[in-house]
Amino acid sequence: MRHATRDELLGQGTPITYPPHRALLQQGDESRHVLLITSGVVKVVASAESGYDMLLAVRIAGDLVGEMAAFEERPRSGTVLACSDVTARIIQVRALEAFLTRHPDAMRAILHMLSARLRWANRRRIDFRAYDSLTRLARVLAELSQAYAQPLPDGDGKRCDLGVTLTQKELASLAGLALNTAEKNLATLTTMGLVERRYRTITICDVPKLLEFAKVVADNPY
């Protein structure tokens, strides 16, 4: 996206702020706007009729959320929760559609974003059949580290903070694992020296080794 287009997009809609744990969008709601995240981290969670909550995705600054329901004119399929202080722009879908019509480079950027999300979803479906539970968890951690990780000063470029705060239940949801299986596998990855764990914090000890173990290519576009 060209700089001028990006600047114009950041001027669309109305600015809004959210404190941690506040819902930006609510599952089932029929509102017709999207949110452009300008700072902070959010989680997308879906609740099944059984009451089970599943983490679907993590989104950061520069991401759109709520676009599926807005474009399709259907109820929201998930709830978006602030993980930190979050700032965003509320953009009505008709205004966004008009903006994208005026700016083909922005349309291409949105299509690339949606394609990346579809690739992520497709990989999780393939992983469910193609890999054992340990590898599946490692692949989720590896791809999260590629997208969000923050290098640590003591790591010579190999050691990094995962970049998002996730519970073990949320990691299990992303990998399609039972909680006890995810806990055992996370302990195994810790014993292998690939990760370190503290309360709701995961450090990747050696990113190249984790990518190799997880069979994830280093130039993953997600």
Regions from the PLM with identified roles:
Residues L134-A138:
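Short, leucine-enriched amphipathic alpha-helices that occur as contiguous helical runs
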